[in-house]
Structures are given as structure tokens and as C-alpha cells.
From Swiss-Prot:
Pathway linked to the protein: Protein modification; protein glycosylation
Gene symbol of the encoding locus: pglC
GO BP term (any one): protein N-linked glycosylation via asparagine
Species annotation: Campylobacter jejuni subsp. jejuni serotype O:2 (strain ATCC 700819 / NCTC 11168)
Protein name according to UniProt: Undecaprenyl phosphate N,N'-diacetylbacillosamine 1-phosphate transferase
Summary of the function given for this chain in its UniProt record: Glycosyl-1-phosphate transferase that mediates the first step in the biosynthesis of the undecaprenyl-linked heptasaccharide donor in the N-linked protein glycosylation pathway. Catalyzes the linking of uridine 5'-diphosphobacillosamine (UDP-Bac) to undecaprenyl phosphate to create the first membrane-associated intermediate undecaprenylpyrophosphate-linked Bac (Und-PP-Bac).
This enzyme's EC code(s): 2.7.8.36
Catalytic activity field: tri-trans,hepta-cis-undecaprenyl phosphate + UDP-N,N'-diacetylbacillosamine = N,N'-diacetyl-alpha-D-bacillosaminyl-tri-trans,hepta-cis-undecaprenyl diphosphate + UMP
Keywords on record: Glycosyltransferase, Membrane, Transferase, Transmembrane, Transmembrane helix
């Protein structure tokens, strides 16, 4: 009952409340990103519930700087000072409140990954798409980018099989603690984690 009905109601109400409460933060962050790097919003297609494709929203924290060959510079070079602050405080995820409001996402669930990963999942890993993807999830509070893809997917599937209101509350509480401690954002020495290749 919780997964099918109350979780969506809870998501909608909480997203609405948080959008109102955080609207000043969202506006100030957008303004400062506009001033410091020009572009504000990053959008990308991601697979959601039952692998249905939706457009995810994030604050854009990296510039589009390229080398003399026209290739994008490394993530480390494109992530500027204010972008680092936005990421360290997880402010880049705030725009996903709109995804939750629309019903594309939930507050808690497996993170929505790249569309190109879909054919790489095995049968068990595909179960992560049996629920709405989340802003945070069981994998994010148990290692995030510091653990292997295989371990992340194991944690995602555990969540799908054990979803409950109490588990969601626990994950949100642990997420808040991690944001305050600014922990688990990326592996040491990397801005983003390596891509999934079906074996890692």
C-alpha cells in the first residue's frame, strides 16, 4: 500500500513544501551560476520507472570549456570554484524537486543513471527500474561513489525488495547527515565516478 499509494502522496506534498522553503536558495544559486559561468540548468534523458525515459533537471556545475581540438576538458578542469561549493552542499540536486513533483522521481529510490547503461544490466540489476528513481537512495547512504557499481546495484535491488516508509525515513535521515558532513561525493581524486561498463 505504501509503495503504490502513500509514497507518491508523501513525495508530492514534501516536494511542494521544500520548493517553497528552498525557493530563495534556488534563486540565489541560479543567479550566482549565471554570473560565474553563464549557464544555469543541466538537463539529460534518464530511465525511470519501468525504464520510461524522462528529462532530469540539475544545476549545471561544470563549464563547457574545450581544448584546441574541440574536446571537452576533464571534469576537474571544468568544475569551477562556485560549482565545487554547489556540489559539496548537494545544491545541484535541488532542481530534482521538480522531477519529484512531476512524478518522474521519488525522494528515495535507486539513482537514475545514463540511458546507455540499460543494455548492460543483468536480470537482477534491471529490478532497480521497478520503482521510481530517487534523489537519494540506499546505495547513496552506504558508500555512494566510493563503492563499486556491482555493490551499488546490490543495494538498489535490496531497496526495491524491502521498500517501506521506515526505510525511506532512515535513508532521508542518513542523507541529511552526509550532506552536513559533505561526505561520499566522489572517489578520492575524482569529480565523478567512472562509467559503468557491465563488468565493474
Amino acid at each position: 500500500m505504501y509503495e503504490k499509494v502513500f509514497k507518491r502522496i508523501f513525495d508530492f506534498i514534501l516536494a511542494l513544501v521544500l520548493l517553497v522553503l528552498f525557493s530563495p536558495v534556488i534563486l540565489i544559486t541560479a543567479l550566482l551560476l549565471k554570473i560565474t559561468q553563464g549557464s544555469v540548468i543541466f538537463t539529460q534523458n534518464r530511465p525511470g520507472l519501468d525504464e520510461k525515459i524522462f528529462k532530469i533537471y540539475k544545476f549545471k556545475t561544470m563549464s563547457d570549456e574545450r581544448d584546441e581540438k574541440g574536446e571537452l576538458l576533464s571534469d576537474e578542469l571544468r568544475l569551477k570554484a562556485f560549482g565545487k561549493i554547489v556540489r559539496s552542499l548537494s545544491l545541484d540536486e535541488l532542481l530534482q524537486l521538480f522531477n519529484v513533483l512531476k512524478g518522474d522521481m521519488s525522494f528515495v529510490g535507486p539513482r537514475p543513471l545514463l540511458v546507455e547503461y540499460l543494455p548492460l544490466y543483468n536480470k537482477e540489476q534491471k529490478l532497480r527500474h521497478k520503482v521510481r528513481p530517487g534523489i537519494t537512495g540506499w546505495a547513496q547512504v552506504n558508500g555512494r561513489n566510493a563503492i563499486s557499481w556491482q555493490k551499488k546495484f546490490e543495494l538498489d535491488v535490496y531497496y526495491v525488495k524491502n521498500i517501506s516508509f521506515l526505510l525511506d525515513l532512515k535513508i532521508m535521515f542518513l542523507t541529511a547527515l552526509k550532506v552536513l558532513k559533505r561526505s561520499g561525493v566522489s572517489k578520492e581524486g575524482h569529480v565523478t565516478t567512472e562509467k559503468f561498463n557491465g563488468k565493474n
